[in-house]
Amino acid sequence: KFVSINPVKTGYSAIADEWLGIRPGTDGLFVHSIIYELLKANKIDWKYLERYTNSNWLVYNNPGNSNHGLFAKDENNQPLIFCKTKKTILKSSEENKKPSFFGSYNFNGNNVVPAFELITKELLSDNFKPSIVADQTDIKENVIKRIASEIAETAFEKEIELPIEWTDMNGVKHDKMIGRPVSMHAMRGISAHSN
């Protein structure tokens, strides 16, 4: 399914399966509302986040301190995570770890939290509820919720599995590739707006 979210119904919007006429300059707000819904429904690819992103890396959470917002690193400049099974802070490159995406921890007298904790705190704000965003974007609440639901269904119930061996960035070999047949092409819209 091809959904076009654009203020005007020209070009690719005219041939899309569905066109959503959005108020100019609010596409970032719309995307935040989609993310809000996906977080609420727990439709998150945790394995992907764990393996291929820095969302579980610890961040200094010390407002007013010079290290606030920076990644916590060890003496060798290696990013750190909190391991749920070992109940301790480890290097992100450590093997046999189960990183936490949530929580607050102490590292050398500093408060640190996983980056995902900060992301969810921001994106689960009432500001991004579809009921609030609908009035600002001109896209109805039920449509925002439906689009989020369709993204989740396609990503998690229609995944693609390819029997192709590959090696990831950490040198770990895999016997198959998992694909989530969902994408978004934002063109210049999101980068050119303040929301």
Where are the regions a protein language model picked out?
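Structural beta-strand/beta-sheet cores of well-ordered domains, especially the beta-sheet scaffolds
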Residues: 1, 18, 180-182
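Acidic catalytic cores of enzymes that act on phosphate-bearing nucleotides/polynucleotides
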Residues: 144-195
